[in-house]
């Protein structure tokens, strides 16, 4: 019955989707269920992470959302960071270009999703140019990444920006690229992600999980010049075939992290999936009891990492002061 209902859509899709994707979608739509596998310690409660939506006092842990003309995912991202315990500031490219903002007082920056500069010349090309060809913005970015107490996250358009600026794998001679989806269509759907064992600040504790997440992009294909083992892969689409792999990414990669695990670029929108009610589907035995999904843990991990760094720096300064006093 469902095949009969779907057949008209398939006939229309054949005239729109490229590279045989319409046929693959029709053949696989009922073969790729979104699977969930949570870590045993996940309870689904805010109290598990010591967080509350009612917080009204600053935590002192600062994150900045960086946005450009056409960014449209900053509200969900700001709330995800706030709920996890960050104090969040809004930074526009104009702030960086003019020198009003230097990023010196923040430990985490996030590039949000959207369509910066309407994707003219390609996704994130103009946004990258705003950093590369404006001295004050470039200086702020370079100084931020030169520090050892910083994290960064790029989602969707922000992921494309990080790849364009070569912020994830600067140690490799050849730079990876983000290309148009194989279907040559904008892909928007709720699908499954698998988190492999990985060494990253945000996703390390989620290793072994299978989670649902939203994708919404037209140029989300990771095209990578080296073998998979050269990269710190932190998330994969749960299926290699379209539409489970919505863009044809090499090795079914959905997210990459830097070699040290501090900087993460991901195409799907984890900030749009932190609550069960945001998910297109969720385990029936948990959807009425869980307050949050495991995706919130990624943001909490980031906040805890920064907290630990700040305490370490404070302790080092204290010991240095005591040593000077003893002399």
What is each stretch, according to the model?
Residues 104-109:
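Short acidic/histidine-rich motifs immediately flanking catalytic phosphotransfer sites
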Residues 99-101, 142-145, 175-314:
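Amide-donor transfer/coupling interface in amidating biosynthetic enzymes
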Residues 75-90:
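Short helix-loop-beta junction
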Residues 1-62, 70:
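Intein/HINT protein-splicing elements and their conserved insertion hotspots or analogous self-processing inserts
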Residues 112-200, 285:
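Cysteine-nucleophile active-site neighborhood
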Residues 91-99:
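Short acidic loop-to-helix transition motifs that present clustered carboxylates
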């Amino acid at each position: 019955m469902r095949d009969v209902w779907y057949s008209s859509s398939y006939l229309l899709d054949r005239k729109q989707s490229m590279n045989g994707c319409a046929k693959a979608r029709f053949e696989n739509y009922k073969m790729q269920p979104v699977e969930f596998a949570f870590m045993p310690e996940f309870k689904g409660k805010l109290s598990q992470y010591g967080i509350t939506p009612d917080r009204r006092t600053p935590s002192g842990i600062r994150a900045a959302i960086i946005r450009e003309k056409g960014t449209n995912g900053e509200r969900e991202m700001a709330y995800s960071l706030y709920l996890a315990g960050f104090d969040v500031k809004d930074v526009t490219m104009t702030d960086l270009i003019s020198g009003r903002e230097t990023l010196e007082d923040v430990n985490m920056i996030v590039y949000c999703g959207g369509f910066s500069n309407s994707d003219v010349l390609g996704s994130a090309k103009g946004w990258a140019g705003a950093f590369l060809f404006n001295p004050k913005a470039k200086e702020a970015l370079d100084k931020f990444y030169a520090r050892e107490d910083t994290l960064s996250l790029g989602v969707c358009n922000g992921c494309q920006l990080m790849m364009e600026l070569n912020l994830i794998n600067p140690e490799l001679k050849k730079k990876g690229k983000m290309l148009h989806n194989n279907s040559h269509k904008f892909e928007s759907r709720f699908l499954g992600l698998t988190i492999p064992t990985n060494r990253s600040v945000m996703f390390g504790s989620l290793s072994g999980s299978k989670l649902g997440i939203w994708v919404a992009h037209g140029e989300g294909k990771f095209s990578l010049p080296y073998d998979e083992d050269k990269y710190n892969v932190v998330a994969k689409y749960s299926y290699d075939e379209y539409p489970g792999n919505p863009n044809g990414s090499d090795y079914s990669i959905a997210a990459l992290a830097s070699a040290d695990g501090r900087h993460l670029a991901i195409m799907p929108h984890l900030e749009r999936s932190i609550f069960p009610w945001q998910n297109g589907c969720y385990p029936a035995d948990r959807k009425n009891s869980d307050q949050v999904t495991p995706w919130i843990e990624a943001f909490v991990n980031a906040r805890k990492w920064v907290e630990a760094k700040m305490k370490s720096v404070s302790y080092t300064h204290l010991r240095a002061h005591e040593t000077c006093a003893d002399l």
